[in-house]
Amino acid sequence: MKLRLAALIIIAGILFFFNLGATSLWDPDEPRQAIMAREMMDRGDYIRPYLNGVPYLEKPPFYSWMIMAAAKASGTLDEFASRAPSALAALLLVVITFLLGCRLGDERAGFLSGLVLATNYQFLSNARESVMDMTFAFFIGLSIYLAFVSLEKDKRLSFALSLIPGAFAILTKGPAGLVIPVGVIFVYLIFKRRLKRYFVPLVLGSILATAIASIWFLLAGESYIREFILHQNVTRYTNAFDHIESPFYYFHKLFFNFMPWSLFLPFALYGAWRRRYLLPLLWFVMIFLFFEFSQSKRAIYLLSAYPALALMTGLYLRDAWETLVARGWTNLLLKTLAGLFILIPVGAIVAVHVLPEADVAVFREGPKSLYVYLSILFLAGTGFLVTLFKRKQDLALSCFLFFLVFTGFFYSAYYMPLVDRTSKSLTLITDPLGEYKKTKKIYTFGFNSAGIIFYIGKPITMLRDIKEIKEDERDILLIVEEKPTMHLRETLEKSFVPVKRVKYEKDQYIFYVRKNG
C-alpha cells in the first residue's frame, strides 16, 4: 500500500506542482484571489476581503488566508503562492480518493481511482489554477471520507466530528460546503439502514460545523451576511442572475471535462449500481442533482463530484479491464482509442507545418522540445496499440496510463508556458507600462481585468462611461481595448494621445495619456 501511495503522490505532485508558478495569473478568477490576499496583508485586516480597494462581499476569506499562508512560507505573494493551496488540495484529494478506493475495493482500485482523478482534464486544469473550488471540493471530500471511516468503525463521536471540514468549506465558498456532505451522508445512512443510530451525531456535527463557520460571519458584519448568504447563495441558486444555462448543460460539460475517462463513465456508473458501490454513486448523484436544480450553472461547480466519478471509474477498471482487453468488440474500441492516441502527436506535427502561419506561429517559433514531447506520446500510443493486439492486459493499461500522465506533464511543462508568454499573460499589457505604473493614475475602458490590477500592483479605476474622466484633471493613463472602442476614437483623441499599442490574445490595447500629460 505504501509503495502505491508513494508512487501516486509523486505522479500527482509532478502533475500539479511542476512549473506551477511559470505562467501568469489568468483572468478572471486567478488574479482576483491573489489581489484579495494582497489587500488583506496590506491593510492588516484579515476578516474582510477587499478587491481593488472595495469591500468584496461575494465570497468568504478562507482561500485568501491559504494564499497568505503560502506567501509567508515561500517569501512572496506570486503566481506559485496563489496557486499552491489549490494544488495542495488537489493532491490531498487524490490521496483521499486512493484511501477510499482501497476501502471500497483494494490497493489496485485505489491506485487506479487516484490516477483517474489526477489525469482527467477538468481536475488537472483546476489543480494548477488559483481557484477556490478545489479547496472547496477537498473539504467536502474530507468530510465524506471521515464520515465513511467512522461508520466502518462504528464511532459516533468521530462521525459527528467528521463534519468539521464542512465549516471550512463554508468559509471557502458557501453553505453548500456543508449541505452537500450532510446530504450525501444522510442518504447513505438511509440506504445502509443506519440513520436511527447516527441521526443525532449527524445533527450535532452539522450544528458544530455551522457554529465554527458562523464566527467569521459575526466578525465580518451584517453586510457580508446579507450579500453573501442571501444574494450570492440563495438568490443565485433559486433565481440566477448570471451563469444561466439549459437543463442539459452539465451532461455535455461532464462528458468533455472528464475526458478521457468519460468514455468509461456509462459502464462505470452501471457497474457501481450493479456491484452496490453506494458511497461514490450517491456522492455523484447527490451533487449532480444539487447543481442541476440550481438556476446558475458552471462546469467547475461539479468539481466536488469528481472524486466519486474517479472512484467508480477506478473500481470499474479494476473489475473489468481484463475483460475489456480480451473481448473482441471492446478490444476493437480500445484499439480505436489507441489509434487516436497515435494520431494526436502525428497530427500536431503535421498541423505545425501545414496550417497558416498566423495560426501556428507560436509553435513553429517555440522550443524544439515540442518534437521530443510528441515523439514520446507517439511511442506511448504505439505501445498501447501493440499490447492490445497481443492481449497483454497489464502492459496495455500501463501504456494507457503513461500516455495520460505524460500528456498532463506536456500540458504544464510546454503548452501552458508557451501559450502564456505569447498570448495569455497580462504582463503583455502591464510590462510595457514602464514608469507609468508608478507615476500616473490608471483607468481602463471597454474591459475589466483583475489581472491588470494584480500586475500593476495598485487599485485602478474601470470606467463604464468615457465621460467619467472628463472632469479628472490629474495626470492619468487610459488603457482601452481597440475593437469595442473604435467608435470612440475621435472623441478620445480630442483630449488624449495614444502612446503605445500592445497585442493581448486576439485584440490590440491602446495606451492613452492626456495631450498635456
Cite the ranges covered by each PLM segment.
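Membrane-embedded architecture of ER/inner-membrane glycosylation machinery
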Residues: 160, 271-517
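Membrane-integral, polyisoprenol-dependent glycosyltransferases
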Residues: 1-329, 351, 500-501, 505-508
